[in-house]
Amino acid sequence: MNRLKEIFQKEITPALVSKF
């Protein structure tokens, strides 16, 4: 579960941030 959180913060968060 921790790895999923890591991937989320590393991959998905930057993708969301670059959208805005």
Swiss-Prot record:
Keyword Secreted: no
GO CC annotations on file: ribonucleoprotein complex; ribosome
Entry keywords, A to Z: Ribonucleoprotein, Ribosomal protein, RNA-binding, rRNA-binding, tRNA-binding
Superkingdom field: Bacteria
Keyword Transmembrane helix: no
GO molecular function: rRNA binding; tRNA binding
Family: Belongs to the universal ribosomal protein uL5 family.
Other facts: Under acid-stress, this protein is expressed at a higher level in wild-type B.cereus than in the acid-sensitive mutant strain NB1.
Function: This is one of the proteins that bind and probably mediate the attachment of the 5S RNA into the large ribosomal subunit, where it forms part of the central protuberance. In the 70S ribosome it contacts protein S13 of the 30S subunit (bridge B1b), connecting the two subunits; this bridge is implicated in subunit movement. Contacts the P site tRNA; the 5S rRNA and some of its associated proteins might help stabilize positioning of ribosome-bound tRNAs.
Subunit structure: Part of the 50S ribosomal subunit; part of the 5S rRNA/L5/L18/L25 subcomplex. Contacts the 5S rRNA and the P site tRNA. Forms a bridge to the 30S subunit in the 70S ribosome.
Protein name per UniProt: Large ribosomal subunit protein uL5
Organism whose genome encodes this protein: Bacillus cereus
